């Protein structure tokens, strides 16, 4: 079977898979290189309809061509042998597995032939070509993985746990509260009540301690809670995930091009899990470098971090000035004159600090409301409304473009 597969994969013809990450991973493991273009119907499906809930071969087969996989014979054989039909499939006799595999391949090809018609109808061939070019890169990234310093991760975990306990002890000492749960609002409410400090509440009246609220609070106890939470999240979410998923000193994270059953985005933005390497801490000047130092470049190589400078503001300014929205031309002129700082230019226009201008500007671009803005700035909703009104008065082009885009989308 392996030699037959090797001959098939050596040809330059298209190779059609459903969930190619799994199949190509095993083929690569067995030393079977793949020539020709790789086509993945599980990636094509969300191009055609990103609002589907299920993207398995069986679900898509029934949805589009009214044909699913018959697993009765495989399940009966597995039961007879006392095995799980999926997890232990490799232990079953080939007579049973072969029938299932043949059916699997045939359904994938039928689905692809149907998808070609839909790609044509929806004029999606250009985006299809793009995604299929990205696919081998994503597969190679997963297979290559990234080196991690496991020993350093383990020692850092211990260090951060000790640090968290020390901060929590200090919170207990300062407040007189004997039991403190960092992520339980009711527990933190007792700390604030003991110190006669006010705090936010949800619309239903429950205590609320958001990240922005704690960051903007002037009392030292709020900063202790914020720091303890950050330390806790760092070791319990990031470091634990690294230690759980590392294999022989490397991380091979799941990378999703589009939406699927296990995650992904409808916009086509890459997403990751096991672990999510896109959410490695960066903003904290102490913890950020600490966690990032756990990821090692290949021997003899070094890391390079590259990013577009103010990508969203530049695009916003381009379209706002082209549309002649109020105030956009001044920002466009600043860009043309040199390497302008969008948020500082807007801050100068409005008469607010750069951090506030950035929070509001990006917030409007992504549809943030008054409540979220108040939370981000650490002020009341009424105060946020006044700041937002001032922003829209002196930099109206941001809201004008956002509203225009929403009208087009609707």
Residue ranges and their predicted role:
Residues 1, 312-349:
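Metal-dependent catalytic core segments for phosphate chemistry
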Residues 13-19, 179-181, 307:
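Short glycine-rich phosphate-binding loop at a beta-alpha junction
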Residues 291:
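Cytosolic ligand/metal-binding cores
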Residues 1-59, 63, 268, 283-288, ...:
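Conserved RNase H-like, two-metal-ion catalytic cores of nucleic-acid enzymes
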Residues 355-366:
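Short, amphipathic alpha-helical "recognition" segments used to contact nucleic acids or chromatin
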Residues 40, 307, 347:
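Active-site glycine-centered loops adjacent to acidic/histidine catalytic or metal-binding residues
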Residues 47-50, 99, 306, 334-337:
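Conserved, non-catalytic sequence blocks in retroelement Pol enzymes and Pol-derived host proteins
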């Amino acid at each position: 079977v392996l030699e037959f597969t090797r001959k098939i994969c050596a040809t330059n013809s298209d190779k059609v898979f459903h969930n190619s990450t799994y199949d190509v991973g095993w083929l690569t493991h067995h030393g079977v290189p793949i020539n020709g273009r790789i086509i993945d119907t599980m990636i094509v499906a969300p191009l055609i309809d990103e609002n589907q809930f299920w993207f398995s071969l069986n679900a898509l087969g029934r949805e589009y061509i009214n044909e699913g996989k018959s697993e009765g014979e495989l399940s009966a054989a597995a039961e007879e042998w006392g095995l799980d039909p999926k997890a232990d499939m490799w232990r079953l006799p080939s007579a049973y597995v072969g029938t299932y595999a043949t059916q699997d391949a045939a359904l994938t090809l039928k689905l692809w032939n149907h998808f070609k018609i839909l790609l044509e109808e929806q004029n999606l061939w250009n985006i299809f070509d793009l995604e299929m070019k990205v696919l081998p890169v994503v597969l190679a990234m997963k297979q290559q993985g990234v080196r991690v310093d496991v020993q350093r991760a383990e020692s850092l975990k211990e260090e951060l746990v000790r640090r968290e306990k020390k901060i929590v002890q200090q919170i207990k000492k300062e407040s007189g509260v004997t039991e403190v749960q960092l992520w339980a609002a009711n527990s933190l409410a007792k700390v604030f009540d003991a110190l006669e400090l006010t705090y936010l509440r949800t619309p239903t009246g429950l205590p609320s301690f958001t990240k922005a609220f704690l960051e903007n609070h002037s009392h030292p106890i709020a900063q202790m809670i914020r720091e303890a939470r950050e330390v806790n999240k760092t070791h319990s979410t990031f470091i634990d995930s690294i230690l759980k998923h590392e294999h022989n000193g490397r991380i091979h994270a799941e990378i999703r091009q589009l939406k699927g059953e296990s995650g992904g985005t409808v916009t086509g933005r890459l997403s990751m899990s096991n672990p999510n390497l896109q959410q490695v801490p960066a903003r904290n000047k102490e913890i950020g470098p600490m966690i990032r130092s756990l990821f090692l470049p290949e021997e003899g190589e070094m890391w390079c971090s590259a990013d577009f400078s103010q990508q969203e503001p530049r695009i916003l300014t381009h379209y706002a000035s082209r549309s002649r929205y109020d105030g956009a031309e001044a920002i466009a002129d600043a860009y043309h004159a040199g390497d302008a700082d969008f948020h500082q230019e807007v801050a100068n226009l409005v008469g607010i600090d750069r951090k506030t201008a950035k929070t509001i500007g990006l917030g409007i671009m992504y549809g943030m409301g008054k409540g979220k803005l108040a939370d981000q700035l650490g002020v009341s909703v009424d105060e946020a409304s006044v700041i937002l009104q001032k922003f829209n008065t002196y930099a109206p082009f941001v809201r004008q473009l956002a509203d225009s885009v929403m009208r087009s989308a609707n």
